[in-house]
Amino acid sequence: MRIKINFKGSNTAYENNNLKQVKGWFEDNAIGRHNDMHDKFSNYSLSPMMGGKRNGKYISYPDGGYVYFTTMDIELINMVSNNLFCNCKGSKVGDLEYKWFESVPDFHIHSDFDLVRTMSPVLMRMKDKSYMTVKDEKFIDELLSRSKRKLIKVGLNENKVNTLNMSMFHPENASTVNMQYNGIPNIGSKVMLVVTGDKHVRETLYSMGLGMSTGCGFGTVTVNE
């Protein structure tokens, strides 16, 4: 299930990204700051602010911006929808004022495989504080392993989860991205993937996002029609 959260336009220019501001607004107005769904594991994906126009290292949203919220958790989507309806009038992310939210079509899951593209970088921090990126030979192995652990954690059948597989699509176009979050430098990966396996498993994975910190704007994906 997917929600598109729309914001009115502003000519204010923002430097780099506004991941922290989006997350803060979402916690204050839609999901609450005091729950167990933040930080280490989120069963949802919250995208960065999209719809902007970039000029060098700055980005502005003269025509408005939008954020995607995606989850397979019905209770969570209902809670967020109710809070957006009741609590958000006049609230802002920076100078971008909340406008409305709308349900959008779920991911189109194909019968055999999906072509999946990252809308925001996939983040995988290792125990030694280094980052696993598309430049690493074991990137896919690590991403697949983490994805399976997340899927099992939300209650999916382990045998069905183990049907999941993924490979790079046009790896020559994959890239790394340096992004700061709350003053902390992070290195993420932009990539296209071929994903196979049980259809419900695939859909659940996309709804949670890829990698870590999917509730902070990382790892948001889209599926090619």
Feature-to-residue mapping (PLM):
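RNA-interacting cores
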Residues: 1-225
